[in-house]
């Protein structure tokens, strides 16, 4: 169930999927951001612009939480990190749903991100059982 990176470090499938989600959130945000950066007709910025940064920050937090959970020896110590991972994936998923209502061609890529989060959750379930 482990993969190896090019520099011979063990990378678990859940770690790899978290990195994939992070990369995907950056790409989607870069694609959506120019559409949201324009001022609206009322002169105000689109409030959804902040969700693009939020999904990047949240997905960036997944890997450190995974690493910390894997480093802990006792299940009680791991629990905090496991809960954090669950919260992060839920918030990323919710922010994807919010961004799907925006006026941008980039929103077409958000279902892909949501599918990746669903795959991550399945991996997470198996991974949690193996810790």
Predicted segments with their positions:
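Amphipathic alpha-helical assembly/interaction segments
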Residues: 1-131
């Amino acid at each position: 169930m482990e993969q190896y990176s090019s520099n011979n470090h063990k990378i678990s499938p859940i770690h790899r999927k978290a990195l994939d989600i992070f990369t995907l959130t950056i790409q989607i945000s870069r694609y959506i951001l120019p559409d949201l950066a324009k001022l609206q007709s009322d002169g105000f910025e689109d409030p959804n612009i902040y969700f693009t940064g939020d999904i990047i920050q949240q997905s960036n937090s997944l890997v450190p939480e995974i690493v910390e959970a894997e480093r802990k020896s006792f299940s009680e110590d791991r629990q905090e990190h496991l809960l954090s991972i669950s919260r992060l994936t839920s918030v990323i998923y919710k922010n994807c749903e919010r961004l799907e209502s925006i006026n941008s061609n980039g929103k077409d890529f958000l279902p892909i991100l949501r599918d990746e989060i669903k795959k991550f959750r399945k991996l997470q379930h198996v991974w949690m059982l193996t810790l």
